[in-house]
Amino acid sequence: MAANRSRPVAVVTGASSGIGAATAVALGRRGYQIVAGARRLTRVRRVVGDLGLALPLDVTDQESIDTFVGEVKNAFGRIDVLVNNAGLALGLAPISQASDDDWIGMWEVNVLGLMRVTRACMPLLRKAKHGHIVNMGSIAGFETYKGGAGYTASKHAVRAISRTLRLELNGEPIRVTEIAPGMVETEFSTVRFSGDRKAAKDVYRGVKPLVADDIADCIVFAVTRPAHVDIDEIVIRPIAQAATWLVARKS
């Protein structure tokens, strides 16, 4: 894809499936030049098509991040929108039985990965006339639930990072938005339950959950507001979900 310096550039992490894929496509259709990053390069290439660049990215690996950002710099010279979407949940064990590996895995991606990518992209965000950082949080960043301590703690951290970024970037033309979805049917639960599709399907039993396009629509809304308007956060959940742990299910 030949770079067009007049069109805005949107970087989306975790773009091989789910919310990341839907967001890359939605922004591409709105005229953004897309740079989509993910570990599963073949899948992210299929997602992006002719909307932009598909590049390998592992947010737990600083060398991978540096190479990725270097490619963006060479192709476009700036980033107008950064969507920190890469994230995951692992397990539902109570704290008394918590797995170090699960907790480390979630924090490496959800928290440190977000920090590393944001840090590496900041010089290119500052090159844009108006930059925008969109962090994928969760309603789990506002609440807690049994068995979810590792994940909810990581999403509380995302909320803290987003709020701190607004303080640190105050006075600069860079907006910060946190998107906090509730129940969204994607590969999320399949990953959480280590590929157990029945357990993943049971999460959505008797409920019409959100889908990835619902979240992508919120992201498009936030980034297309006038430059002086900063949507701090959007909390979105299916009507059947009143809290992380309270869902009205139909038999």
Please report, for each region that a protein language model flagged, where it lies by residue:
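C-terminal helical subdomain
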Residues: 178-182, 197-245
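The beta1-alpha1 cofactor-binding region of Rossmann-like NAD(H)/NADP(H)-dependent oxidoreductases
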Residues: 57-67, 100
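Active-site helix of classical SDR
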Residues: 118, 154
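Conserved glycine-rich cofactor-binding loop
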Residues: 16-17
